[in-house]
């Protein structure tokens, strides 16, 4: 029987929208935009799943999952399933995080395609701990068939290597936000709205850049024109001044 370990006191350590099974189970399940976690837990059995729940944002949502997983060394597998989240592309971002990690300077998930794929509230060490602790991340993105998901969970359980060699790693998120919705000016908005806002911002930046370039070119051309006129006048002065002086003598 695989060796087990004690999770962090009070595990799960971060509140969220999830169901908890057996803390000694080796699998955590991320249902992305679908709320099928209870069906999965019931079908698979609580002894096979440690924690399951949706994750709808590619930043704070992923951070919460990481925080709860690394606080329990018994979790060695992850299953990504359920509907992909439009705009956020949380599943793709989660997979990119596992495969590539994050930029150490900016916290950006390397290779992520979501709207705001930055893990800014957890240290890089937490991300690397997750990547090392999880021996396999099963990609069932856009799969909502409970039987297929349970089959993947059972295959993970059969390969359970036992608890991670290091003890629980606990972190506190620097910023708590609602996972389901982002907020703009205090008002909750959907993933699609967030994406549109960022696209509009990109357009604004582009327009400002074009305007700045136009002003620069106008000034540059105006300067060249003025310089050309000064050059012509100076040339005429130097050309005709000796003639005037000599003619006067």
Curated annotation (Swiss-Prot):
Question: Which gene name belongs to this protein?
Answer: mtrA
Assembly, in brief, is: The complex is composed of 8 subunits; MtrA, MtrB, MtrC, MtrD, MtrE, MtrF, MtrG and MtrH.
Q: Where in the cell is it found?
A: Cell membrane
Name the keywords, alphabetized.
Answer: Cell membrane, Cobalt, Membrane, Methanogenesis, Methyltransferase, One-carbon metabolism, Transferase, Translocase, Transmembrane, Transmembrane helix
Topological domain (Extracellular) residues are 247-249
A single GO molecular function, which one? Answer: cobalt ion binding
Q: Which GO terms describe its cellular component?
A: plasma membrane
Record InterPro entries: MeTrfase_MtrA/MtxA, MtrA
Swiss-Prot/TrEMBL catalytic activity: 5-methyl-5,6,7,8-tetrahydromethanopterin + coenzyme M + 2 Na(+)(in) = 5,6,7,8-tetrahydromethanopterin + methyl-coenzyme M + 2 Na(+)(out)
What sections of the protein cross the membrane? 226-246
The cofactor required is:
5-hydroxybenzimidazolylcob(I)amide
Recorded source organism is Methanopyrus kandleri (strain AV19 / DSM 6324 / JCM 9639 / NBRC 100938)
Q: Which GO terms describe its biological process?
A: methanogenesis, from carbon dioxide; methylation; one-carbon metabolic process
UniProt protein name? Tetrahydromethanopterin S-methyltransferase subunit A
- Residue positions annotated to bind 5-hydroxybenzimidazolylcob(I)amide are 88
Q: How does it sit in the membrane?
A: Single-pass membrane protein
Tell me the function of this protein.
Part of a complex that catalyzes the formation of methyl-coenzyme M and tetrahydromethanopterin from coenzyme M and methyl-tetrahydromethanopterin. This is an energy-conserving, sodium-ion translocating step.
How cofactor binds (record note)? Answer: Binds 1 5-hydroxybenzimidazolylcobamide group.
């Amino acid at each position: 029987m695989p060796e087990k370990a004690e999770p962090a006191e009070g595990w799960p350590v971060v509140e969220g929208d999830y169901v908890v099974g057996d803390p000694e189970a080796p699998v955590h399940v991320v249902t992305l935009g679908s709320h099928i976690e209870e069906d999965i837990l019931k079908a698979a059995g609580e002894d096979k799943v440690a924690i399951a729940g949706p994750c709808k944002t590619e930043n704070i949502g992923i951070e919460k999952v990481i925080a709860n997983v690394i606080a329990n060394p018994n979790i060695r597998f992850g299953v990504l399933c359920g509907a992909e989240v439009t705009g956020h592309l949380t599943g793709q971002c989660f997979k990119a995080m596992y495969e590539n990690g994050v930029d150490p300077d900016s916290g950006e998930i390397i290779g992520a395609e979501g709207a705001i794929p930055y893990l800014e509230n957890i240290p890089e060490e937490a991300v690397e701990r997750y990547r090392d602790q999880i021996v396999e991340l099963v990609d069932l993105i856009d799969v909502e068939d409970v039987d297929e998901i349970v089959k993947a969970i059972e295959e993970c359980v059969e390969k359970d290597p036992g608890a991670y060699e290091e003890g629980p790693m606990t972190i506190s998120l620097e910023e708590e936000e609602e996972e389901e919705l982002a907020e703009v000016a205090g008002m909750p908005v959907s993933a699609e709205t967030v994406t549109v806002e960022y696209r509009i911002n990109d357009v604004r930046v582009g327009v400002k850049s074009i305007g700045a370039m136009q002003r620069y070119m106008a000034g540059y051309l105006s300067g060249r024109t003025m310089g050309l006129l000064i050059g012509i006048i100076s040339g005429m002065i130097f050309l005709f001044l000796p003639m005037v002086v000599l003619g006067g003598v």
